Amino acid sequence: MSLYRKHRPASFGDVIGQEQVVSVLEKQIKNSNINHAYLFSGSRGTGKTSVARIFARAIGTQSTDLYEIDGASNNGVDEVRELREAVQTLPFQSKYKVYIIDEVHMLSKAAFNALLKTLEEPPAYVVFVLATTEKNKLPETIISRCQNFSFKKPHESDVRELLILVAKKEEIELDKGSLALIALLAEGSYRDALTILDKVLAVSKDKRIFVHEVEKITGAPSSVLVNQFLEALVTGDKKKAIGVIKDATDSHADMRVFTKLILRSARFAMLLVLAADMREFIKNEISDEELVFLGSLGKGLEAKKLPNILRALLKAYQEISVAYIQSLPLELIVAELPT
């Protein structure tokens, strides 16, 4: 069984990073104030379906009265009409029948119209939980008939917290660098973080995972290349910087991830210059070797150097996804370095 399925939260207390959603739902259950329709929206892997299942169990719905529907593959008007007929039957064992419709934005216009009729006058024993990653694609008539909950994209610290919990349960040793890199690569998705950990664990011999293994399995650029490029930018060494970009390209590194890692390191270097008390915070984010490197990088620099580099990197990061040549935005940064 995959780590994500094995460690899916089983109760509200297990949910990480969605305290505002959990708090409201728990109060509604305590006060027996259950709505007939809920809309859970947010980016992928943030726990929408997991919380929907927990909510269903918390209001006493047995498995025989819980229905999960994939909106992507059941998006026609006929399927929704069948659903409308099904909701008319009483629950088998529970007070409520709960219908979880995932990726609800994939329904057709005709299907939405059919669903709307059910949402307008649902039986008292039916609860709908609609989940979507693209709320903007839903008709306003659907949104207005649901109680809306926005699932926030978790911070890297939230993702790291989950990874630490799972690693402890599975008796996995994760070094600080691998923990930080997996959290960054997951891009705010708990599911993606555990999927990456699963993938790395599959080739690990003794459940000890180091950052170089994560780099190798995921194709992430090495920290050596990241540090070399950042150092070249700071010192104005154009030849070295172009050489590092070539090395990253030759190793088939994802230039978007490469730039993101450089951005993170440049930001930490700037924070170390601006506020010495940030050192403790940064120490928990990166390896001791990186901390020493970034601390020395900012020494003696003019005040605007690192902020200017960060602005250029941010611009490059935004341009990479639309660039015909992925390395070009970084190459332009190098070309525009003062001589």
Label the model's feature ranges:
Residues 1-148, 154-158, 164-166, 246, ...:
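P-loop/Walker A NTP-binding region and its immediately flanking N-terminal helices
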Residues 46, 52, 58, 79-82, ...:
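Extended, largely alpha-helical regulatory/partner-binding modules appended to the mid-to-C-terminal parts
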